[in-house]
Amino acid sequence: MIWVSLDEPRRALPNIHEFGNDEWVWVNCGPYEWNAHSSRQLENFTDFGHFPWVHPGLLGDIKRPVVPAYEVRTDGHVVKYDIVRPEAPNTDDFPVFANASTQAPMRTSHYEVHTPFTLLLHLGWGDKEGMVYFFVSQPVDEEHSRGFLIIGRNYNYDQPDSVLQEFEDVIFNQDKTIVESQLPKKVPYDITRELHM
């Protein structure tokens, strides 16, 4: 992934302090080509309420679908929020998360939404193990986007990259079907132009 500024940058790039740390390994996933605007791709990545319904047994637990309360705050141009929420236990096919609990595991997520169409997500499970998602959606045009994802973790050092890549391919394909059906293709600034259920 290459960032280019044709003029003086308006904002700094997101600070990912785990980059360069030898205890972290990094996996490139995607790219993910969608027939949807980048705003939809990013919106989907920040919406954890759909996990139990769209990704049951992978990201969400259908027996614990309620989204706990959380607070959204801004820090300059960055939107931040933290949430502790139910997570599905690891599966035999995709043992990608560091949750030790096989019964009702919980996950702490720290979200940072940056402009343009960029997300930095830190995951934790209460111990030293952690995971970092760095997602950027490239607008191709008003109705198409290309998502790039880099994931870092400080555990599962011997696990082949393909396990995490295949997991993300499954997740993104499940989301793609739904997001590509949403109208308008671009997230409207006027919330009355959409029906939220």
Language-model region placement:
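C-terminal catalytic domain of Rieske-type non-heme iron oxygenases
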Residues: P9-M197
